[in-house]
Amino acid sequence: MINQIDIKTRERMEACIQTFHNNISNIKTGRASPTLLHNIYIEYFGSKTPLRQVSNIIVEDSHTLKINVFDDSITSLIRKSILNSNLDLNPVLQGKDIIIPIPRLTEERRKQLIKVIRGDAESSRIQIRNIRRDANDKVKRLLKDKIISEDNEHTSQSKIQIMTNEYIKKIDCILEKKEKELMKF
């Protein structure tokens, strides 16, 4: 029973870390990356289709992305989708390809992004602590129902606390890495 609680807790904390990592990986650092366009969808044959399924996204250099479109008829749709996204990008048509220059970040914009990232990190830490609280409550219920002993309760809560510390450190490492990446340019 306690092992199931530990496993579920670890899975939930891992999902929280993954969500945090995905959220901040979409934040522009002034460097070209195909992941920047992973949330772009176009209307293709009546359904929303991810950009990466209808094209190849290539890093030309550190400040330029190139999109090789598989079907020339949707090039303008892709350009329009990128313009309508909130990424502040200005795609340029070049033959059947789309070139996207990635603007350099200003110092002010970097500081704003760092504040946003730190806010996301704090929200993720809070989620981790809430997951810990839920797990500890389940363990206390098991003790109350006399399914486990007090020793088992203390051992389990210690494991949960160690897990919590581990995942909060992971959040801090991801945050630190992203901050360095933002301040690099």
Swiss-Prot record:
CDD domains (UniProt xref): RRF
Chief location of this protein within or outside the cell: cytoplasm
Name of the encoding gene: frr
Pfam families named among the record's database cross-references: RRF
GO molecular function: ribosomal large subunit binding
One GO BP: cytoplasmic translational termination
Name of the protein this chain belongs to: Ribosome-recycling factor
GO cellular component: cytosol
Reported function: Responsible for the release of ribosomes from messenger RNA at the termination of protein biosynthesis. May increase the efficiency of translation by recycling ribosomes from one round of translation to another.
Species for this entry: Buchnera aphidicola subsp. Acyrthosiphon pisum (strain 5A)
Domain of life: Bacteria
Cellular compartment(s): Cytoplasm
Keywords on record: Cytoplasm, Protein biosynthesis
